[in-house]
Amino acid sequence: MDIIQTIMDVLQYVAMTDTVRPPKGVREAAALGLRLRERQPPSNRAGTPVGLARARDLANGRPVSYATLKRMKAYFDRHEVDKQASGWRPGEEGYPSKGYQAWLLWGGDPGQRWVLSELRQAGLVDKDGVTL
């Protein structure tokens, strides 16, 4: 292994173990997701155990590791398409949909923007948002 690769590996390790705190908009979105979920009948409650834990951490402003930010990015990438479903916006039938609730639990649109910004600054995604 050459010295450059070793340095790159160390930098990536540091970036993955360092933590950042979610900004206000992310905390508010996660808290809203928890409130909306709580008001739903059990049959319309969204959120896996992982998503609920993430929401509680975000809503409470707990530090988030870069490894977790990468997992959050993967969630947002997979579920971006959910925004096209019915029940995403107030006034639509089925609002708030399970997809909308879950999106908020992960920090919502502010969370998506924050995650991408943090990962870009850490050099963990490229300029197009592709995870490195």
What is the role of each PLM region?
Residues 3-132:
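Extended terminal accessory/targeting regions
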